[in-house]
Regions:
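Gly/Ser/Thr-enriched, mixed-charge loops and adjacent short helices
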Residues: 33-38, 42, 151-285, 291
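Phosphate-binding and adjacent anionic-ligand microenvironments
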Residues: 292, 296-298, 320-322, 340-536, ...
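An N-terminal, well-structured beta->alpha segment
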Residues: 5-103, 192-229, 240
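Short glycine-rich or small-residue beta-strand-to-loop segments that form or flank ligand, phosphate
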Residues: 85-91, 231-234, 410, 549
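Short Gly/Thr/Asp-enriched flexible loops that form oxyanion-binding sites at enzyme active sites
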Residues: 99-107, 150-157, 307-327, 363
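Glycine-rich phosphate-binding loop plus the immediately following alpha-helix
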Residues: 156-186, 327-351, 355-366, 420, ...
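Conserved phosphate/anionic-ligand binding catalytic regions in large, soluble enzymes, centered on
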Residues: 38-58, 143-144, 232, 236-248, ...
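N-terminal small/polar loop signature for handling phosphorylated ligands or for N-terminal nucleophile
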Residues: 87-150, 255-310
């Protein structure tokens, strides 16, 4: 059907409710808007659904959510694991509770029990819940740190990680096979509860989750000793982190935790924020104001679904607060865990740290220093979760920590996704340890630069919206793949990795080897002296990202090098 035919189908079919029809009637004469809403189905990709909330096939609404859930249900039934049930969580966004309820009732209508949280919860707690309940799958209704007009739907599998190949592709096939909305099943909540197929969960899972987090503390005595001396400012950015973060810090004994009042409670409009992303310095405006007022040691922000953590720490020499990238905060926690586990004799046999190919190269000297195996996986925390499962199945290694550059990490194996609640807890322990030794987190970071090298990373993003955007992004990748640059400025490309074609080319000798990772549309350029550049189209947005990293002789030298590399990459493009 053409997009106008699709519009008329939605307007005239009794399946769609009047509220949906009224929304469409209001835009029916705006052809560009009609086209954008109906020119395609909202794509159920490897990460699930993500899109603008509204009526239409290319929007997040009860009908697209129901259809996605029917596809998931069909796949679960084909595998014969429907008796295990599915756990469901949701964030603070508009329509998140409604979409979660819609998914639960669709599952119930297919004979699959839904365990749905009573109110909003962090994404990592969903990962923990489905493992604890022994579910076959999990759903989180969230659009993470996207603007308020968005929502999304992520699917997790029985190990607690987001679905990976081949399961992700098989679920996509099932969703795409549904051509008629009328074939999608649903039932009332009342009937689902009577049938024992709709169960609300909450406190019991919360308590178990908290107990599991506390197992990651290495020096509880240090926290007790410094609990009255350290000042923490925290903002949940109007999302799910408020209650769990406050609870864990309170139960550990931290006495001075100041929560940003304007961003404390859930707000689907994110009124005080341009963009609820802890990677964005503007997200810290209110928190930094409070930090200066309270003379805080550390300033923390979790994103709306509490899987990413942003950090500022005080530089006592200047009195200013320094922003930490995800690489920096991840390295602080990694160094602390590896150093203290080694010192206390609690490092497991065959320890491994798992990271992604676009994360800082500082992971290499740190893991070498402590005799820990470094394993690199494709971008996306689900691949770190997949490694934990592999370790458990084979006994090859013991997981000690995992991190990615995009402000996500995981200490422990209680969840299989990045967990900002455990990250807050770990970082506050590190801050307490530093305070005991008359240091700040920034002092510790500087000492790590002096020990391992001045590593610095950045990103350059090209956004291409609309129908032509995907084509233009494909053309850029095609050009780089077929004619890889010999150099970026004065940095020669030493090795070129094409993950889609599973080949690594030594640019000098021409020798070819394999990447050793699953196929993915990613290009990686190895440059001299720990410099690198990686090109990767986003899986959820009309963007192509260029990740870059360098190693300098000082903080200033590293900054200058990364700025020059960014300009050289732009020149090649």
């Amino acid at each position: 059907m053409s997009y106008m035919d699709e519009l008329n189908f939605w307007l005239n079919d009794d399946y769609f409710d009047q509220k949906t029809k009224d929304e469409l009637l209001a835009i029916r004469n705006n052809e560009a808007e009609v086209e954008d809403r109906f020119y395609k189905e909202l794509e159920f990709g490897t990460g699930g659904l993500r899109g603008v909330i509204g009526a239409g096939t290319n929007r997040m609404n009860v009908y697209t959510v129901r259809k996605a859930t029917q596809g998931l249900a069909n796949y679960i039934i084909k595998r014969g694991t429907q008796s295990k049930g599915v756990a469901i969580a949701f964030d603070s966004r508009r329509m998140s509770p409604e979409f979660s309820d819609e998914a639960a009732r669709c599952l119930a209508a297919n004979g699959i029990k839904a365990y749905i949280f009573e109110s909003l919860r962090p994404t990592p707690e969903l990962s923990f819940a489905l493992r604890t309940l022994g579910c076959t799958a999990g759903i989180v209704v969230t659009a993470s740190h996207k603007p308020p007009e968005y929502n999304g739907y992520k699917v997790y599998w029985e190990d607690g990680a987001q679905v990976t190949a081949p399961i992700d592709k098989d679920i996509i096939t099932e969703v795409q096979a549904i051509k008629d909305y009328h074939t999608v099943k649903t039932m009332s909540r009342e009937d689902a509860e009577k049938a024992g197929l709709y169960q609300v969960i909450g406190k019991e899972i919360d308590d178990k989750y908290m107990a599991e987090l506390k197992k990651q503390i290495i020096h509880p005595d240090v926290i007790q000793e410094m609990a009255d001396d350290i000042k923490i400012v925290y903002t949940p950015l109007c999302g799910t982190g408020n209650k769990p973060v406050r609870r864990i810090l309170s139960e550990l004994g931290f006495k001075h935790v100041y929560v940003v009042p304007e961003q404390e409670n859930p707000d689907p409009n994110f009124t005080t924020l341009d963009y609820p992303n802890p990677e964005d310095p503007k997200a810290f405006t209110y928190a930094l104001r409070l930090a200066k007022e309270k003379d805080a040691d550390i300033v923390l922000a979790t994103d709306p679904d509490a899987d990413r953590l942003g950090v500022y720490a005080k530089d006592t020499k200047t009195g200013e607060y320094v922003a930490f990238t995800g690489n920096m905060s991840g390295m602080l926690i990694a160094e602390y865990i590896l150093r203290e586990k080694t010192a206390t004799g609690t490092m497991p046999e065959n320890p491994a740290l798992v990271t992604t190919i676009v994360t800082t190269n500082m992971t290499k000297p740190i893991t070498e220093a402590y005799g820990v195996k470094l394993i690199e996986v494709l971008t996306g925390f689900k691949f770190i979760g997949e490694q934990i499962k592999f370790f458990e199945q084979t006994g090859s290694n013991n997981y000690v920590f995992g991190l990615e550059e995009s402000y996500g990490c995981l200490a422990g194996t209680h969840a299989r996704d990045k967990d900002a609640v455990v990250a807050v807890m770990c970082l506050c322990e590190v801050a307490a340890y530093c305070k005991k030794h008359n240091m700040t987190l920034w002092d510790m970071m500087v000492s790590m630069y002096e020990k391992y090298g001045y590593f610095k990373e950045t990103q350059y993003t090209i956004t291409m919206k609309g129908i032509d955007g995907a084509r233009q992004i494909a053309e850029i990748m095609d050009k780089l793949r077929k004619n890889p640059p010999k150099a970026f400025g004065d940095l020669k490309v030493e090795k070129f990795r094409d993950y889609l074609n599973d080949v690594v080319i030594d640019m000098e000798s021409g020798e070819k080897t394999t990447t050793g990772l699953p196929k993915s549309n990613v290009l990686y350029f190895e440059l001299p002296d720990n410099a690198w550049c990686c090109a990767r189209p986003s899986g959820t947005e009309p963007k192509i990202k260029f990740y870059m990293g360098v190693k300098g002789n000082s903080i200033e030298d590293a900054q200058a090098k990364v700025e020059k590399l960014t300009e050289d990459v732009k020149a090649v493009l």
